[in-house]
């Protein structure tokens, strides 16, 4: 039996190459078997794309990445045109192979020590008042990338003292306490970590992750920073039931999470997990009502909702769906 080919630093693996060695194999979808998107899931393109071009040019100029582009988010045009972007630090190559996600897998390069300053300058030039910072998983780093998050927060606030910063962090597998100790030096305004799906579906959707670890990360941060909102996001359409999602919501509240995003999973390519169901808007509304009933201070629930979709409005408690 031949040994797997050694990953080369900086080389992006996508689609079939990315998911070739995950526990639950993904059978490439045939067009005939793929569910047809309902009319209420169509994305509306903005009338002008100049703002989109400007943001992309600013990112390229400074060698920065957005999760909007790297993960092929369907809301890219709307968010860029709105003047918002979710910056992705620590490169564009993830050490995990989650088959729902379109971010490339591989062996990442060493973190760019200049990225925190370049990010802060770009945010200043874009005159942003609210930013979301996320990252790929960096299991190759001793702290999982926590110090780089802290460095970015510090530099952003130096140049943008009035800004609000939300961070969407990985699970810091096996390094939670060390990572939180580092983040305590430069805490964000909102702490976000996505559970993504119900625990029953972790093996196929989040290989390498652990449902309880993710809950513990959220709870421990909240215990250390009781005044900072905690947030998590979930997808629907991977085979879960509404009751399974409701149970996750109860788990999140039991771990003191206050903000929620809930959206429809969309298959990035035929090599990714298939969409098993398109969830009607009315069911999202029902889950939103339930989330608020059990104590979430804000719940953004709808087919096109994503974790950082209009995050500034979410943080203000405004309706997002």
Curated annotation (Swiss-Prot):
<keyword id="KW-0963">Cytoplasm</keyword>
<feature type="binding site">
    <location>
        <position position="79"/>
    </location>
    <ligand>
        <name>[4Fe-4S] cluster 1</name>
    </ligand>
</feature>
<keyword id="KW-0479">Metal-binding</keyword>
<dbReference type="InterPro" id="IPR003698">
    <property type="entry name" value="Lipoyl_synth"/>
</dbReference>
<dbReference type="InterPro" id="IPR007197">
    <property type="entry name" value="rSAM"/>
</dbReference>
<feature type="binding site">
    <location>
        <position position="308"/>
    </location>
    <ligand>
        <name>[4Fe-4S] cluster 1</name>
    </ligand>
</feature>
<feature type="domain" description="Radical SAM core">
    <location>
        <begin position="80"/>
        <end position="297"/>
    </location>
</feature>
<dbReference type="GO" id="GO:0005737">
    <property type="term" value="C:cytoplasm"/>
</dbReference>
<dbReference type="InterPro" id="IPR006638">
    <property type="entry name" value="Elp3/MiaA/NifB-like_rSAM"/>
</dbReference>
<protein>
    <recommendedName>
        <fullName>Lipoyl synthase</fullName>
        <ecNumber>2.8.1.8</ecNumber>
    </recommendedName>
</protein>
<feature type="binding site">
    <location>
        <position position="73"/>
    </location>
    <ligand>
        <name>[4Fe-4S] cluster 1</name>
    </ligand>
</feature>
<keyword id="KW-0949">S-adenosyl-L-methionine</keyword>
<dbReference type="Pfam" id="PF04055">
    <property type="entry name" value="Radical_SAM"/>
</dbReference>
<dbReference type="GO" id="GO:0016992">
    <property type="term" value="F:lipoate synthase activity"/>
</dbReference>
<dbReference type="InterPro" id="IPR013785">
    <property type="entry name" value="Aldolase_TIM"/>
</dbReference>
<keyword id="KW-0408">Iron</keyword>
<keyword id="KW-0004">4Fe-4S</keyword>
<dbReference type="GO" id="GO:0051539">
    <property type="term" value="F:4 iron, 4 sulfur cluster binding"/>
</dbReference>
<keyword id="KW-0411">Iron-sulfur</keyword>
<keyword id="KW-0808">Transferase</keyword>
<feature type="binding site">
    <location>
        <position position="98"/>
    </location>
    <ligand>
        <name>[4Fe-4S] cluster 2</name>
    </ligand>
</feature>
<dbReference type="GO" id="GO:0046872">
    <property type="term" value="F:metal ion binding"/>
</dbReference>
<feature type="binding site">
    <location>
        <position position="68"/>
    </location>
    <ligand>
        <name>[4Fe-4S] cluster 1</name>
    </ligand>
</feature>
<feature type="binding site">
    <location>
        <position position="94"/>
    </location>
    <ligand>
        <name>[4Fe-4S] cluster 2</name>
    </ligand>
</feature>
<feature type="binding site">
    <location>
        <position position="101"/>
    </location>
    <ligand>
        <name>[4Fe-4S] cluster 2</name>
    </ligand>
</feature>
<comment type="similarity">
    <text>Belongs to the radical SAM superfamily. Lipoyl synthase family.</text>
</comment>
<comment type="pathway">
    <text>Protein modification; protein lipoylation via endogenous pathway; protein N(6)-(lipoyl)lysine from octanoyl-[acyl-carrier-protein]: step 2/2.</text>
</comment>
């Amino acid at each position: 039996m031949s040994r797997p080919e050694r990953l080369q630093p900086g080389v992006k693996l996508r689609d079939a190459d990315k998911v070739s060695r995950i526990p639950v194999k993904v059978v490439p979808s045939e067009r005939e078997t793929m569910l047809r998107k309902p009319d209420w899931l169509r994305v509306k393109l903005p009338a002008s794309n100049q703002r989109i071009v400007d943001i992309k040019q600013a990112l390229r100029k400074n060698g920065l990445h957005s999760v909007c582009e790297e993960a092929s988010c369907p809301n890219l045009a709307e968010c860029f045109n709105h003047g918002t972007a979710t910056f992705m630090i620590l490169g564009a190559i993830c050490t995990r192979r989650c088959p729902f996600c379109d971010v490339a897998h591989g062996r990442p390069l060493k973190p760019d020590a200049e990225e925190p300053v370049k990010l802060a300058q770009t945010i200043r030039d874009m005159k942003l008042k609210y930013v979301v910072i996320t990252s790929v998983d960096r299991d190759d780093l001793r702290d999982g990338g926590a110090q780089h998050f802290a460095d970015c927060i510090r530099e952003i606030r130096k140049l943008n003292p009035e800004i609000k910063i939300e961070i969407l962090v990985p699970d810091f597998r096996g390094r939670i306490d060390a990572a939180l100790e580092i983040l305590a030096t430069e805490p964000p305004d909102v702490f976000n970590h996505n559970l993504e799906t119900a625990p029953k579906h972790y093996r196929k959707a989040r290989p390498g992750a652990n449902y309880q670890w993710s809950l513990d990360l959220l709870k421990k941060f909240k215990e250390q920073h009781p005044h900072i909102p905690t947030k998590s996001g979930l997808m629907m359409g991977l085979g879960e039931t509404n009751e399974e999602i409701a149970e996750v919501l109860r788990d999140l509240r039991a771990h003191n999470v206050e903000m929620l995003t809930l959206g429809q999973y969309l298959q990035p390519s035929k090599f990714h997990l298939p969409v098993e169901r398109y969830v009607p808007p009315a069911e999202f509304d029902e889950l939103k009502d339930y989330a608020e009933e059990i104590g979430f201070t804000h719940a953004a629930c709808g087919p096109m909702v994503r974790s950082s979709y209009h995050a500034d409005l979410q943080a203000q408690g405004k309706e997002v769906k």
